[in-house]
Amino acid sequence: ANKRPVWIMGHMVNAVYQIDEFVNLGANSIDTDVS
């Protein structure tokens, strides 16, 4: 069987405190919007 990684992305994490929120919801990757 060909196993491929699954990414559960926390999208638009714009503040440090949001990282824990997204990880607690099951995210295993974080997408930030930096300008």
Swiss-Prot record:
The active site is at residue 11. One of its GO terms (cellular component) is extracellular region. Keywords: Cytolysis, Dermonecrotic toxin, Disulfide bond, Hemolysis, Lipid degradation, Lipid metabolism, Lyase, Magnesium, Metal-binding, Secreted, Toxin. It is found in: Secreted. Belongs to the arthropod phospholipase D family. Class II subfamily. It catalyses: an N-(acyl)-sphingosylphosphocholine = an N-(acyl)-sphingosyl-1,3-cyclic phosphate + choline; an N-(acyl)-sphingosylphosphoethanolamine = an N-(acyl)-sphingosyl-1,3-cyclic phosphate + ethanolamine; a 1-acyl-sn-glycero-3-phosphocholine = a 1-acyl-sn-glycero-2,3-cyclic phosphate + choline; a 1-acyl-sn-glycero-3-phosphoethanolamine = a 1-acyl-sn-glycero-2,3-cyclic phosphate + ethanolamine. Expressed by the venom gland. Its EC number is 4.6.1.-. The lineage of its organism: Eukaryota, Metazoa, Ecdysozoa, Arthropoda, Chelicerata. It is an enzyme of class 4 (lyase). GO terms for molecular function: lyase activity; metal ion binding; phosphoric diester hydrolase activity; toxin activity. Binds 1 Mg(2+) ion per subunit. The keyword DNA damage does not apply. Its cofactor is Mg(2+). Contains 2 disulfide bonds. This is Dermonecrotic toxin LrSicTox-alphaI-1. It comes from Loxosceles reclusa (Brown recluse spider). Dermonecrotic toxins cleave the phosphodiester linkage between the phosphate and headgroup of certain phospholipids (sphingolipid and lysolipid substrates), forming an alcohol (often choline) and a cyclic phosphate. This toxin acts on sphingomyelin (SM). It may also act on ceramide phosphoethanolamine (CPE), lysophosphatidylcholine (LPC) and lysophosphatidylethanolamine (LPE), but not on lysophosphatidylserine (LPS), and lysophosphatidylglycerol (LPG). It acts by transphosphatidylation, releasing exclusively cyclic phosphate products as second products. Its main location: secreted. Mg(2+) binds at residue 33. The keyword Transcription does not apply. InterPro entries: PLC-like_Pdiesterase_TIM-brl (IPR017946). GO terms for biological process: killing of cells of another organism; lipid catabolic process.
